[in-house]
């Protein structure tokens, strides 16, 4: 790997230098060829294994943990930081630079009495979801590899330590700006320094002045809205939408007790530590705005409040428009280039009626959408009909849907288009759990199989049909722990 060290050299007060502590008996558990290409790597080697496991130095790496704060479940925590993630620097690739981080690399000054380690199950889950979201077309950080060990660590019980090698376009979070506004008061110069760095690195078309700052914040608002629209359309629940888990670039970031929906449930909670459902699936759009408001508060020393509010007021429109675009494609509806607010509302109601029907009939979210690939939209009798209990209610919806759809001349092409946007394969929690259990037993084949299938989520892959089925009773709607 070839590195540059812009964050390390230009922002010395934004991190602590810390070196990883190696893990015993490191071995590859998973490797992403797709992610490796981003930083010009070929095959996993023993030398690379030793370097990324913390047992040997990586040439050109600087090793540091970033400091930030954040709002966690609504309350402000003044000092967080990378408690178990150590960044090596920005690795150069054919299409730009990517931060390389060792998640589980050992304790840092921000570990808050933790051991700085990640357990194998959480490392595998982060690897799988990073790559799954990418291949579904959702903005996300990436995962290069998972490195296992025989090092014992204690959570609820004894587990083994592992390292996820994460790639990110940037590790700058909403919480970075909050730290230098709230926790380090009177340091507007640091806010400006961080803001200028962010613009130069990731928004080179914007000037480092008030006009550029205003344009940048509006872009952050729009990117965040688009990200959450993706989550709602694909049926993804993040689980821990704290402001320190929000990427300034609008990428899915810092995965913990996430879940893809099995049965559609608007108020689905995937996080065992969130009994009141602050971060439930249906709450994500509102939390996205709330988090942006916290970021806006942190930026008031450098951007006037009126300008911040004006940008925040664009959030709902950006969210709805992107969500409509994604859902219209899923349904096969033509995009209305010059749609009116009334027409948009009609489409939202049509979509909403269908998801309500899904919830009332306890239908599988992804599999129901996939059924549109076998639908003859010109037929008065829908092949979806047998899935519903209240046939009158479905028939009324289907008639409204056909009226909005209009005439379809090439049914086969229409069906293929639906299959290209409605995935057959998603990372169901029970599939991840089965792969993790197999790894614990020394069998990597289920993990490798699942990873390869998730690389082509829209393909039929008939030999892997079992991975597309609804989960068994024990695996339906699994709620995960935050411990990792």
Swiss-Prot record:
Presence of the UniProt keyword Transmembrane helix in the record: no
Domain of life per record: Bacteria
Molecular function, one GO term: ATP binding
EC number assigned by the record: 2.7.7.-, 2.7.7.108
Cofactor (UniProt): Mg(2+); Mn(2+)
Keyword annotations: ATP-binding, Magnesium, Manganese, Metal-binding, Nucleotide-binding, Nucleotidyltransferase, Transferase
Active site: 244
Catalytic activities: L-seryl-[protein] + ATP = 3-O-(5'-adenylyl)-L-seryl-[protein] + diphosphate; L-threonyl-[protein] + ATP = 3-O-(5'-adenylyl)-L-threonyl-[protein] + diphosphate; L-tyrosyl-[protein] + ATP = O-(5'-adenylyl)-L-tyrosyl-[protein] + diphosphate; L-histidyl-[protein] + UTP = N(tele)-(5'-uridylyl)-L-histidyl-[protein] + diphosphate
List of residues binding ATP: 81, 83-84, 103, 115-116, 166, 173, 254
Binding site residues for Mg(2+): 245, 254
Parts forming coiled coils: none
Functional note: Nucleotidyltransferase involved in the post-translational modification of proteins. It can catalyze the addition of adenosine monophosphate (AMP) or uridine monophosphate (UMP) to a protein, resulting in modifications known as AMPylation and UMPylation.
NCBIfam families linked to this entry: PRK00029.1
Family: Belongs to the SELO family.
Protein name: Protein nucleotidyltransferase YdiU
Lineage: Bacteria, Pseudomonadati, Pseudomonadota, Gammaproteobacteria, Alteromonadales
């Amino acid at each position: 790997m070839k590195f540059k060290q812009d964050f390390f050299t230009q922002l010395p007060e934004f991190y602590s230098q810390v070196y990883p502590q190696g893990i015993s008996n490191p071995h590859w558990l998973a490797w992403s060829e797709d992610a490796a290409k981003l930083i010009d790597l070929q095959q996993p080697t023993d030398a690379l294994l030793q370097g990324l496991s913390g047992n040997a130095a990586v040439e050109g790496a600087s090793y540091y943990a970033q400091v930030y704060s954040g709002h966690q479940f609504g309350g402000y925590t003044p000092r967080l930081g990378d408690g178990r993630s150590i960044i090596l620097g920005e690795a150069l690739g054919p299409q730009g630079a990517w931060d390389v981080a060792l998640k589980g690399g050992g304790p840092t000054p921000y570990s808050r009495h933790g051991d700085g380690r990640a357990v194998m199950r959480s490392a595998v889950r982060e690897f799988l979801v990073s790559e799954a979201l990418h291949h579904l077309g959702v903005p996300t950080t990436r995962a290069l590899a998972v490195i296992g060990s025989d090092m014992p660590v204690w959570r609820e019980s004894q587990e083994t330590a592992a390292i996820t090698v994460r790639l990110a376009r940037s590790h700058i979070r909403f919480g970075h700006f909050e730290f230098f506004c709230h926790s380090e008061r009177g340091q507007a110069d640091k806010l400006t320094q961080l803001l200028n760095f962010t613009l130069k690195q990731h928004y080179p078309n914007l000037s480092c002045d008030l006009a550029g700052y205003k344009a940048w914040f509006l872009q952050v608002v729009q990117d965040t809205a688009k990200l959450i629209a993706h989550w709602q359309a694909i049926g993804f629940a993040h689980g821990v939408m704290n402001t320190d888990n929000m990427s300034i670039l609008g990428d899915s970031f810092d995965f913990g007790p996430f879940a893809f929906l099995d049965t559609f449930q608007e108020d689905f909670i995937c996080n065992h530590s969130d009994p009141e459902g602050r971060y439930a699936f249906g709450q994500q759009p509102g939390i996205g705005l709330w988090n942006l408001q916290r970021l806006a508060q942190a930026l008031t020393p450098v951007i006037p409040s009126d300008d911040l509010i004006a940008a925040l007021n664009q959030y709902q429109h950006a969210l709805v428009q992107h969500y409509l675009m994604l859902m219209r494609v899923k349904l096969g509806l033509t995009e209305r280039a010059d749609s009116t607010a009334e027409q948009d509302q009609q489409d939202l109601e049509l979509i909403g009626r269908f998801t309500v029907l899904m919830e009332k009939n306890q239908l599988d979210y992804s599999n129901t959408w996939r059924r549109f690939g076998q639908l003859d939209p010109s037929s008065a009798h829908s092949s979806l009909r047998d899935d519903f209990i209240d046939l009158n209610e479905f028939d009324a919806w289907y008639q409204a849907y056909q009226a909005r759809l209009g005439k379809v001349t090439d049914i086969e092409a229409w069906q293929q288009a639906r299959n290209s946007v409605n995935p057959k394969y998603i990372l169901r929690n029970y599939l991840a759990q089965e792969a993790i259990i197999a790894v614990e037993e020394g069998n990597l084949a289920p993990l490798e199989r699942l990873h390869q299938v998730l690389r082509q989520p829209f393909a039929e892959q008939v030999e892997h049909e079992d991975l597309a089925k609804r989960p068994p009773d024990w695996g339906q709607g699994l709620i995960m722990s935050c411990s990792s």
